[in-house]
Amino acid sequence: MEQVELIPQWYVAPVSVKDEAVVRNLKAKVKALGFDNEILDVRVLKEREVIEEVFSLKSGKLPRSLKNTAFTKWFVLDEDRYLKVKISEKNLLGRYIYIKMIYSEDAWRIIRNFPGITGIVGSSGRGALPTPLDQADADNLEQMLKGISVNPKKRVLVTNTAIVEMDADKFDEKCQYILKHKQVKPEAIAQVNESGEIIDTNQFAQALMEANKAEQDEWNEDVAIVKSEANKVDPSVLIPYLGKYEIVEGDTKVDQLQQFSVGNLVEVHLTGAIHIQGQIKALYQGTINKAVVEVELTTKTQLINLPLENLSFIEVEQSH
């Protein structure tokens, strides 16, 4: 008897809970049961969207916090306006996921009995078999799994659980939001890898402390905080190697600090290859004008003390 070749096909399944959680848990279940030769892949098809909103200091609607997160970024447009970039991802099919499998009763039983999955499109529950995607849609899905969109104006990011499509004019080849940066090449104080990431954050932090300590000797003892987030700043939250200073209460302002302000989102220039985003928390005027900048190193938020010449505003590429 001639053996019939079993060809895997893509199916669509509705889910009742968070889609990526179902995908992740189902993949783990399939592997644990040894069915990964029948249920070959599970994915969510998503679209990444960008919402841009401009806030003005003069309008009084500036949010209390300008902190960057994984999906929210803040940028300075000018001395009065800030740009909030919110990145979101949504399921293109609503509450549906894609499942690639070689149909069998056992594989089908695993799928339909899995928590969070309410069935497969085409199956009525009365003995009707699920309906696979037509060949054209299946081919498109396979192409996207290779990181290639069927739409030339789109880019594709493939993760362990999802296929994420996004506008090519908003995201670069690495699927990072497109920004226009100023580039400078100050003295290197940290080793970086090919991606520009710090190799040893402890070494980096130590280098910063040593660099700032050497410069601190040149400071006057009457260095003052000329502008801060609050009228009073607790010295214990600042960097311990800032030296002696006095806290100036009220909204004292010095105009000659290269137009930097507390709350500005800036780029910290460390080497010719690495640029870290941070937020100004306080400004100082002394022998050398400096700023206290909050940056994130791995998962830890730190305050670092840097000369203003090592900072620059982040410029956003404007569309005309």
UniProtKB/Swiss-Prot annotation:
Coiled coil: none annotated. Gene3D superfamilies: NusG, N-terminal domain (3.30.70.940). Keywords: Transcription, Transcription antitermination, Transcription regulation, Transcription termination. One of its GO terms (cellular component) is cytosol. GO terms for biological process: DNA-templated transcription termination; regulation of DNA-templated transcription elongation; transcription antitermination; transcription elongation-coupled chromatin remodeling. InterPro entries: NGN, NGN-like_dom, NGN_dom_sf, NusG-like, Transcrpt_antiterm_NusG, Transcrpt_antiterm_NusG_myco. Belongs to the NusG family. Participates in transcription elongation, termination and antitermination. PANTHER family: RHO-INTERACTING TRANSCRIPTION TERMINATION FACTOR NUSG (PTHR30265), TRANSCRIPTION TERMINATION_ANTITERMINATION PROTEIN NUSG (PTHR30265:SF2). HAMAP family: NusG. This is Transcription termination/antitermination protein NusG. It comes from Mycoplasma pneumoniae (strain ATCC 29342 / M129 / Subtype 1) (Mycoplasmoides pneumoniae).
